[in-house]
Amino acid sequence: MVADVPDNLKETKDAFLLQCALDCRIGDFMKLSMSNVAVTDDGIPYVQYLPKKTMKTQNDRREKKTPLMLFALEIVKRSGFKFGVLRYASGKSGYNAKIKKLLEHCKIDRLVNLYDEATSTMNRVPLHSVGSSKLCRKTHIDIANKAQVNMYATGLHEVGSSAVEHYSMLEIRDLFMLLCAAFNQPRYRIDKQLNVLPSENLAMEEINL
């Protein structure tokens, strides 16, 4: 997250980190704009949208609401969701190709399994070589799970048990606190103009809980 990258990868880094923070499918991510940003009454910013994949299977058309951690808010304010790199997802110079270059530059080289259908063998390859936008959602869920956030809490996945129902109904404030803990991000509050408020405001709020 804090690694320095060359200028030609800075936009890719911002887009990749923001997509990781939002647990967002690439099709939905490409359509986000500042109109998707909202703020709770107690000052927690979040992104809300109707996921294209799940809206066809849910009768109540529930929006997905994901709180913005501080680093994600900074990217949103800096970019306004306008990423030229998202113009093309595939291709030699597309988003997925640049994600591979970004991960290679940052030395994300942990070995992972990759099945070779031609030879029916399992190969071990560096993670950066198979990086893509799909890795964003996996990264979000893996990190969130480390803070005991069930994967169903972070998106509108099919509900299959009472435990899943509990997690999928987490309030934005609770999910915000859990994600901040998982991603090692500070808790904060903002005003309606997306300005971060002094930390004393948060301290007083927590005292009054």
What kind of feature is each model-predicted range?
Residues 64, 70-120, 204-206:
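Major-groove DNA-contacting interfaces characterized by cationic-aromatic clusters
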